[in-house]
Design a protein with these regions (language model features):
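Conserved, mostly hydrophobic/aromatic
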Residues: 48, 118, 167, 174, ...
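N-terminal basic, low-complexity leaders that serve as flexible interaction/assembly modules and, when applicable
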Residues: 1-75, 200-224, 235-301
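Non-heme di-metal
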Residues: 162, 183, 211-212
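Active-site beta-loop-alpha junctions enriched in small/polar residues
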Residues: 130-132, 187-189, 225-231, 248-252
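Active-site-proximal, glycine-rich beta->alpha crossover segments in alpha/beta enzymes
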Residues: 74-170
């Protein structure tokens, strides 16, 4: 019997808090720092120095994917990063008519260029991407999405497949650019927003198959670091389980140390928020995430 999906409580600040002041100190400018790969790379290195992180993060907002599909973006200021502004679609069918996410044009290309620059300099690059529901939230009113999930699942399957194909090409291009960790978050896909029934179906019918696909395509060349909200949904639907990383017993590594250890050994992690990277955890309590095999589904009928 499938258990309850728990909601992971977000208790960390926004990414903008880590770059306030750094943009000015580096003599970088807005919005160029969000649009130019070289400036992105410079800011990412500066943030790493400021926060004493062991990795570098890109990009500095969560609007790259939606913008690449046509969303209107307000580039904000030094303290408030880019945000989508308004909707460009009124009907779900219009999503299918949008162009593809082109990894060689626009901001995706610049983000990947920044990733490549940093990887070539020996940095461990974490690329943060967002999932389908969050992307759709920048394109269309989510009420239409949730209604479609209930009333027109065939259409929604086409919509989700389109978004998933775009994400697949972006993630594969990221690995080719030297990215070793991909942070995957779909913060809108939660129990409070979607409700347990819709989220359960979305997790089993869309999230799990997509993550299986990405694990196969990426071949563990990069670790996919799941937002714990997504990890909790997988666990609550018995779509995944946790397995100890196998780090040396008796040590207390950071969560970030766990990521670096897991690269090439596990497809996924996600027990804590990415912003908890410096939290120390007993080695035996750092886990990788193992997706349920497709063959296991038949035994639950």
């Amino acid at each position: 019997m499938v258990g309850e999906i728990k909601d992971y409580p977000c208790s960390y600040g926004t990414k903008e808090e880590s770059i306030v002041g750094v943009v000015k100190a580096c003599n970088l400018t807005v919005p160029e720092v969000y649009k130019d790969g070289e400036q992105m790379a410079e800011l990412s290195r500066a943030v790493k120095r400021t926060t004493n992180d062991g990795v570098v993060y890109l990009p500095f907002d969560h609007a790259v994917e939606a913008e690449a599909l046509g969303a209107v973006v307000n580039y904000g200021s030094e303290t408030v990063g880019p945000r989508t502004s308004g909707y460009i679609c009124d009907k779900l069918e219009e999503i299918l008519d949008l162009g593809t996410l082109d990894t060689k044009k626009g901001r995706p290309a610049q983000v990947l260029n920044a990733c490549r620059i940093l990887a070539d300099q020996g940095e461990t690059v974490v690329l943060e991407i967002v999932g389908p529901i969050t992307i759709l939230n920048g394109l269309i009113d989510l009420r239409a999405v949730f209604k479609g999930m209930r009333k027109n699942p065939e259409l929604m399957e086409k919509v989700f497949r389109k978004i998933e194909d775009d994400l697949s090409s972006y993630m594969q291009a990221a690995v080719a650019a030297g990215v070793k960790i991909i942070s995957y978050g779909d913060a809108v896909a939660t129990v409070p927003i979607m409700g347990p029934r819709v989220l359960k179906n979305y997790t089993e019918m869309n999230v799990l198959p997509f993550l299986r696909r990405m694990e196969s395509e990426l071949e563990h060349k990069a670790l996919i670091l799941l937002c714990p909200k997504t990890a909790y949904a997988l666990e609550g639907t018995e779509s995944a389980s946790y397995k100890p990383l196998g780090m040396p017993q008796g040590t207390h590594p950071t969560y970030e140390d766990g990521w670096l250890f897991a690269i090439g050994k596990f497809g996924f992690m996600g027990q804590m928020c990415i912003k908890a990277g410096k939290r120390r955890v007993p080695a035996e309590k750092l886990y990788g995430i193992i997706l349920k095999d497709e063959g296991d589904e038949d035994h639950e009928q």
